[in-house]
């Protein structure tokens, strides 16, 4: 495998409070695994290594907006995510209530994500 800056990047999915913080709504489900695997620390190490070696870093956030809660069909996990308001935001173009919410970045990642170099993709739903 040839890893080079021309065609290799790091993609981080869902580096958000609801998933990675002890205060997140899914902590009871994922917390033991996150701690055991040192997920938070390893994601940070990965982003720092990529940046220090000048590799692109992409973030794929998970957001739900009020309109998403009216979906007619959804799987078990999607239904649960809506019920516990996981990754909820007040609107597509609004940051009202975003800072520190479950949808916000984990605080320790903010300097790495909000550095003006990291590319944040459009949000995914599933």
Task: Identify what each model region corresponds to.
Residues 1-116:
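Active-site acidic carboxylates
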Residues 119-126:
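Glycine-rich oxoanion-binding loops at beta->alpha junctions
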């Amino acid at each position: 495998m040839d890893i080079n800056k021309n065609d290799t990047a790091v993609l981080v999915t869902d580096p958000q409070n609801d998933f990675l913080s002890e205060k997140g709504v899914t902590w009871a489900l994922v917390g033991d695994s996150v701690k055991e695997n040192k997920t938070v620390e390893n994601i940070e190490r990965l982003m720092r290594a990529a940046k220090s070696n000048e590799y692109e870093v992409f973030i794929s956030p998970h957001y739900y907006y009020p309109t998403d809660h009216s979906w007619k069909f959804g799987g078990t996990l999607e239904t649960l995510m809506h019920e516990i308001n996981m990754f909820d935001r007040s609107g597509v173009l609004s940051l009202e209530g975003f800072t520190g919410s479950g949808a916000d970045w984990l605080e320790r990642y903010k300097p790495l994500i909000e550095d003006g170099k990291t590319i944040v993709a459009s949000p995914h739903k599933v």
